[in-house]
């Protein structure tokens, strides 16, 4: 049975990757279908009720700069906003928001339902239709076939998902949802390497049974940050506090006593869990010398009593979970509303993907999110946007696009995955980016919005706001460079009290701002130097561009050197055994990874600069030197 319409792009799955993929393809004008097993759970925050953080906030800003929905939804759902690393340099500052689950889901669903070119249909997908290595559609659980030349799979933890609580386990995509068994079996037939990963979630606690007076209060920032470049503080709902408590030796004894019934430590779970978000069992085992671990007590929303205790993800049996929770200060009488659990699921080796996130084996088939071995809403959303965009470009007959490592954290993410692969759930950090001084949260729009407009991702309202901001920044920089003050100027009397060393020669306003003791806000408040920019985002940009100009210029020069051969393409059909001069080790690694570019090849462990030189000579001799898109 065939559906009566044909689509340009089909997206399977309605989580963070799927929603961004569907919205991106539809914004670009492609007739798009989003298939989900349950329309009510579109945009569901399956684990922690928070968006952003170190590295992750950078991805959210990049999604936003390209017209995505995550940051906008966060502004409407965020019940506590904080800027992390605020005392450090701008490269590592990151926005994090505690979100109301219901408000977030509601906003995402509202955006989806009002997006032109997007159709939503409730059915689980069981099969792919593939003809001559080209995807041509999907088949749902009820045997209904949908036709499309481009399919984006964003299956999350649903592929052969297995939920573990103690030594008991059962099939599930997440708590309360069925797994995708038939689709997982179908995908295992494809020539793509498959593995198993694991993630987990903590028990949810009833706030009415917690004694918050024994915990440290953690308030949000003032003034309040916003997540979206189009956001406004007026969009935020009521703001509330989170709380901090700690485990103790008694907690650790309870956990150690239950390890014989832990699926992780009894060999029941095969999948590898996230290194940077370990279960409480893992923490106690790996950091045996620590007498306590911090726990963040995070509300799940404004109209629910559920609390997310961030830091005690566990798959221990329920009785052990209850005892360990009640051993924690402030939770002596706590009641669990939902037990914690671990979930194992299939993922596919991302080295079998192009950097467009299209599979190398099947034309038109794209993967995004946890299916590629990542963990986190933000990583999923960023991949979803890229996959949906490239699926749309493909059906329009246009070249694929992916930002380079020096252009976006999204570029770092995709390059790491498609070049190096991953054996454990991959999480983004600022430390993964070698050019992080240029890849800041504050300039994500300056880096990406013009490209997003060119690709068709950015609407008129965002483009107008961005253009106005860009113009105001440039005009203000010109003003600061063009206005001068000299030692005999009448402005000196107001200026010198704010300087560590009074000026002894003529100086531009720009030079004054570059002084360590001066910032833009302070300079603009001095008589004769204002008025400054009213837009805080534009003002921040002016300050950073002035104060860090030398460092930024130096990093840009490094990038210019590095990218000379970065985008030189490598044919996917190239057999590296045919390249004279390469060692057997290098041949094996290159044939295994099948890098798309010289840049990717150079980042594979064991590929030496000498091997890269040999490759470049071989390509030149064979007339194969070409620049990748």
Swiss-Prot record:
Tell me its cofactors. Answer: FAD
Coiled coil ranges: none
GO terms under cellular component: cytosol
The entry's localization annotation reads: Cytoplasm
Residues binding NAD(+): 273-287
Q: InterPro entries this protein is in? A: FAD/NAD-bd_sf, GIDA_C_N, MnmG, MnmG-rel, MnmG-rel_CS, MnmG_C, MnmG_C_subdom, MnmG_C_subdom_sf
Q: Which GO terms of the molecular function aspect are on file?
A: flavin adenine dinucleotide binding
**Gene Ontology biological process terms, A to Z:** tRNA methylation; tRNA wobble uridine modification
UniProt keywords (A-Z) are: Cytoplasm, FAD, Flavoprotein, NAD, tRNA processing
What domain of life?
Answer: Bacteria
Major localization listed first in the record, in broad terms: cytoplasm
Q: Which residues participate in FAD binding?
A: 13-18
The family annotation for this protein states: Belongs to the MnmG family.
Whom does it interact with, and what assembly results? Homodimer. Heterotetramer of two MnmE and two MnmG subunits.
Q: What does this protein do?
A: NAD-binding protein involved in the addition of a carboxymethylaminomethyl (cmnm) group at the wobble position (U34) of certain tRNAs, forming tRNA-cmnm(5)s(2)U34.
Official protein name in the record: tRNA uridine 5-carboxymethylaminomethyl modification enzyme MnmG
- Report the source organism: Shewanella baltica (strain OS195)
Q: Give me the gene this protein comes from.
A: mnmG
